[in-house]
């Protein structure tokens, strides 16, 4: 149905609120009750944001919520959303590893599931009208539950009249909500999950200004502050799935956590990017994705040994489109599923071991092995082998270059 004023009398109906416990979503609870008469069911979806969740039940209750769900979906997030992006080497505009983009559909799916369980008629989110998140949440909800209303308070300016955090805090106080909220002065706008942390705002809004990395970084150190010695590691893969780190079997969630630690202390995966948002504007952000950067580099390192040239060329095209579709919030679209099906078909023999060394922001290849390797040492050698004779190249060059030869002869005749 989309984001609009609910039709008819909504008093007593249930609405699902994507809830973090912060100021915005706290203020939304009494606002929904006052303006629409909704019973508010809060849902916090844990995708590894590392926030303190223990006080959320009390905060939601004091804010007037009927109920709170805290949904721990980190393993589901890894297996159903992160893994397809790893296998697709997903990267938007050559730098952004889609940390927020892949998390929003996972959250939207859980919001819809609880809406159906609770018999809710609507879902509400606190995303602003300028960013990509509103699109990702709403496209996911529309795809999974088109019958649900979607409320986006920041776009409902006739009713959501707050102009500042101070306005929101005054409103909460007026409604008897006496809770502490962290100050946003001198702080970045951040999004964190198991895969990454994004930073926006403050000096990053000026593209001429260097990021204040000392103040900004949370997962990582700068390459200049990384250790002076290399950190070696190996990753074992089975059909495009990373299954072991340094010989130790572990889940994808565990591996990402460990690689975030190893990569972070070596200054891996810090990018400063100006990206093109879906809504048309450019935005600047700094992203920390240490574990994800290592996994994607290792995966590409293994694929280049195993996949034939034409498959790699086609996969590159699919990867770019896959990344765009995910960035635009179309996770549940048939196109994303079709693109993923192609990617998955290429992973059948992507098994083996990738070795690398981490050093001051760099990932240095240290060897790759696979039982499905297409690398043939006797073919690649400069010496003549049984399968290849240097003389064979002459006929190939004649045929391969025939169009150029014909064109040159034609131009000479003219």
How should each PLM-predicted stretch be described?
Residues 2-18, 23-414:
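Nucleotide-activated chemistry modules centered on ATP-dependent adenylation/adenylyltransferase
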């Amino acid at each position: 149905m989309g984001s609009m004023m609910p039709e008819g009398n909504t008093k007593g109906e249930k609405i699902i609120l994507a809830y973090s416990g912060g100021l915005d979503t706290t203020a939304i609870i009494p606002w929904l009750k006052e303006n629409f008469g909704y019973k508010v069911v809060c849902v916090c979806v844990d995708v590894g944001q590392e926030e303190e969740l223990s006080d959320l039940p009390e905060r939601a209750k004091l804010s007037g919520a009927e109920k709170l769900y805290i949904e721990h979906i980190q393993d589901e997030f890894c297996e159903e959303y992160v893994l397809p992006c790893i296998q697709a080497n997903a990267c938007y505009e050559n730098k952004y590893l889609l940390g927020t983009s892949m998390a929003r559909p996972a959250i939207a799916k859980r919001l819809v599931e609880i809406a159906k369980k609770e018999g809710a008629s609507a879902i509400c989110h606190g995303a602003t009208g300028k960013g990509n998140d509103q699109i990702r949440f709403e496209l996911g909800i529309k795809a999974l539950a088109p019958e649900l209303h979607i409320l986006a308070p920041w776009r409902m300016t006739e009713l959501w009249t707050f102009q500042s955090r101070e306005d929101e805090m005054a409103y909460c106080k007026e409604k008897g909500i006496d809770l502490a909220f962290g100050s946003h002065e001198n702080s970045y706008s951040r999004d964190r999950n198991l895969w990454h942390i994004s930073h926006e705002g403050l000096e990053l809004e000026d593209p001429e200004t260097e990021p204040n990395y000392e103040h900004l970084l949370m997962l990582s150190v700068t390459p200049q502050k990384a250790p002076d010695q290399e950190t070696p590691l190996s990753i074992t893969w089975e059909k495009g799935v990373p299954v072991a780190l340094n010989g130790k079997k572990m889940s994808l969630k565990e591996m990402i956590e460990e690689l975030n630690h190893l990569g972070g202390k070596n200054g891996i995966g810090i990018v400063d990017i100006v990206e093109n948002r879906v809504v048309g504007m450019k935005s600047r952000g700094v992203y920390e994705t240490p574990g994800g950067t290592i996994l994607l580099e290792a995966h590409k390192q293994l694929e280049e040994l195993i996949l034939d040239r034409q498959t790699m060329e086609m996969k590159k095209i699919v990867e770019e489109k896959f990344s765009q579709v995910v960035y635009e919030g179309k996770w549940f679209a048939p196109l994303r599923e079709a693109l993923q099906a192609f990617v998955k078909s290429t992973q059948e023999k992507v098994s083996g071991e990738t070795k690398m060394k981490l050093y001051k922001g760099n990932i240095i290849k240290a060897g790759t092995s696979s039982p499905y390797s297409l690398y043939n040492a006797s073919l690649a050698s400069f010496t003549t082998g049984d399968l290849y004779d240097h003389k064979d190249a002459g006929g190939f060059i004649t045929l391969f270059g025939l169009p150029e030869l014909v064109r040159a002869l034609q131009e000479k005749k003219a």
